[in-house]
């Protein structure tokens, strides 16, 4: 017990007796000083797992690679989604170039297992004839590839002018008629009438060929080159033969004897 002396107190006060525990109670009633939180020392965390990063890494023992189990490819089932699954052959190597995506849809029926038929080589066009159309006399006769090949002769190869009116007009008949009537003299004329030699004009020969095409009713335009081939084909049967002169031909003797050509007036 503590006794307060009267001399320490101002004025007449009675003396009081306090126990030791009373002072401890008074200390608990003192206000504690307040400090900003930024100046206060941070208390260490009380979480026992907070320092797990500071633990030393345990040592690992060496392992044998043969103990590893081989990996197997696992096929993941494709679920319903907006995009179809990528095929297995669409995985490309990083070393090679990536193929460009195709933006054009390809119909499956455009490709088949049967290969396409190869086209036969196109024949090269023959060398065009010169303007004079000079054929060597010893050259073989040319085959007619146009509609002049339908000019058939009577049986035995003889000429039958009587039945010619009932048949299709032939080229030699067309030319012989022009020379006898004197038509288109600027295109064709007699050189030696008695021998049956006639000549075409180098300037108007195409006009004569065009007239012959219209006479036959051909859809394609007739050219002098085609008409000259038909004239060469007559060399097989003897109606017309080529003379060693440019654009000059001669009727056969049989044709001249049967038709009886007369000199132009």
Curated annotation (Swiss-Prot):
Primary location recorded for the protein, binned into one broad class: nucleus
UniProt GO cellular component terms: nucleus
Region (TAD2): 42-63
Pfam families: Ets
Record's keyword terms, sorted: DNA-binding, Nucleus, Transcription, Transcription regulation
Chain ranges passing through the membrane: none
Chain positions covered by the region annotation TAD1 (Acidic): 1-31
Subcellular location, record wording: Nucleus
Molecular function per GO: DNA-binding transcription factor activity, RNA polymerase II-specific; sequence-specific DNA binding
InterPro entries: Ets_dom (IPR000418), ETS_fam (IPR046328), WH-like_DNA-bd_sf (IPR036388), WH_DNA-bd_sf (IPR036390)
A GO biological-process term: cell differentiation
Task performed by this protein: May act as a sequence specific transcriptional activator.
Family: Belongs to the ETS family.
Record-given protein name: Transcription factor Spi-B-like
């Amino acid at each position: 017990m503590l006794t307060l002396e009267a001399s320490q107190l101002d004025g007449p006060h009675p003396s009081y007796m306090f126990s030791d525990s009373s002072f401890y109670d008074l200390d608990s009633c003192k206000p504690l000083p307040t400090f900003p939180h930024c100046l206060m020392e941070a208390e260490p965390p009380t979480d026992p797992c907070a320092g797990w990063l500071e633990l030393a890494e345990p040592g690992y023992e060496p392992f044998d690679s043969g103990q590893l189990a081989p990996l197997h490819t696992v096929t993941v089932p494709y679920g319903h989604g907006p995009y179809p699954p990528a095929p297995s052959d669409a995985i490309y190597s990083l070393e090679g170039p990536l193929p460009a995506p195709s933006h054009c849809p390809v119909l499956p029926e455009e490709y088949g297992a049967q290969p396409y038929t190869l086209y036969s080589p196109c024949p090269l066009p023959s060398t065009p004839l010169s303007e004079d159309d000079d054929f060597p006399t010893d050259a073989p006769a040319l085959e007619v590839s146009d509609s002049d090949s339908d000019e058939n002769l009577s049986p035995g190869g003889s000429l039958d002018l009587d039945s010619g009116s009932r048949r299709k007009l032939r080229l030699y008949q067309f030319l012989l008629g022009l020379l006898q009537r004197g038509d288109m003299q600027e295109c064709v004329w007699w050189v030696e009438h008695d021998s049956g030699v006639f000549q075409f004009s180098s300037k108007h020969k195409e006009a004569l060929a065009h007239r012959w095409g219209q006479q036959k009713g051909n859809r394609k335009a007739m050219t002098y080159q085609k008409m000259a081939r038909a004239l060469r084909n007559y060399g097989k049967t003897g109606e017309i033969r080529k003379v060693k002169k440019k654009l000059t031909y001669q009727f056969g003797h049989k044709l001249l004897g049967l038709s009886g050509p007369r000199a132009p007036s």
